[in-house]
């Protein structure tokens, strides 16, 4: 579409689409994008900074404004800490929502004055002022007359189409596989080069919380190599500080522990994984 409008691409990088898209559509660009993203474009002609975050908030985006009127932003809060103008103050108001919902539920983070750009929002920043708008929202008012079977078929088709779109890659692709329904379904649709699983041993030596056997069986059935590791309690306890460092804010979801080790395992073999 952009090429048809006369835009000439000089690279094969997908991010170049954002630059040409902004040239053509301005702040309407975010609503036209599909995928997971968080980006900023600085328009030197208008002195406007334009940014957006994907509709589900898959990609993080943090920002704050210093007393000097500077806008700091990044995909991690820790990337802002070294700036001399960053406000190093705890946001006590974030504690109650966190204890209630077990995650950082406010747009303002645990750092006073540092915010998350909400999912499905774009912003323009000029002359020290932030203007923000939502560009997408789900509509639950629509009632469907489809049968259960038709709904299931529609969902299956949508999932497979989405997985296929994400499957496009110039390098090997891996998949996290817990042995549960959702990861097994995605793995079967994706057919990655490798799968990755971690499990826990219980104090009595059992495998109550371990699904690596099911993950290995599915991988074998699909003809895919499965890399798996068993985690000890010592490994998990020793990693808590590092895990919290990477999370930036308090995180009560216990799945962040196996996910940390799962990412380490996968990174030794692939760079793109689901």
Residue ranges and their predicted role:
Residues 252, 270-274:
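Mid-to-C-terminal catalytic subdomains of enzymes
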């Amino acid at each position: 579409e952009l090429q048809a409008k006369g835009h000439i691409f000089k690279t094969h990088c997908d991010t170049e689409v954002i630059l040409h898209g902004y040239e053509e559509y301005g702040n309407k660009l975010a609503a036209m994008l599909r995928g997971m993203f968080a980006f900023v474009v600085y328009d030197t002609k208008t002195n406007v900074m334009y940014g957006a975050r994907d509709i589900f908030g898959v990609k993080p985006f943090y920002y704050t404004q210093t007393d000097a009127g500077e806008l700091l932003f990044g995909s991690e809060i820790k990337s802002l800490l070294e700036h001399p103008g960053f406000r190093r103050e705890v946001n006590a108001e974030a504690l109650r929502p966190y204890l209630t919902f077990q995650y950082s539920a406010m747009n303002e983070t645990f750092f006073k004055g540092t915010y998350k750009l909400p999912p499905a929002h774009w912003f323009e920043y000029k002359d020290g002022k932030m203007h923000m708008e939502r560009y997408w929202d789900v509509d639950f008012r629509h009632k469907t007359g489809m049968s259960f079977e038709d709904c299931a078929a529609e969902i299956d088709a949508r999932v497979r189409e989405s997985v296929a779109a994400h499957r496009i890659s110039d390098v090997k692709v891996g998949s996290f596989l817990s042995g549960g329904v959702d990861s097994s379904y995605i793995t079967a649709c994706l057919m990655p080069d490798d799968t990755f699983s971690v499990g826990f041993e219980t104090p009595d030596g059992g495998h109550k919380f371990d699904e690596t056997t099911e993950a290995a069986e599915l991988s074998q059935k699909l003809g895919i190599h499965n890399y798996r590791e068993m985690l000890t309690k010592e490994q998990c306890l020793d990693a808590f500080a590092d895990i919290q460092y990477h999370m930036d804010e308090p995180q009560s979801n216990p799945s962040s522990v196996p996910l940390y080790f799962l990412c380490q395992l996968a990174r030794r073999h692939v760079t793109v994984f689901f």
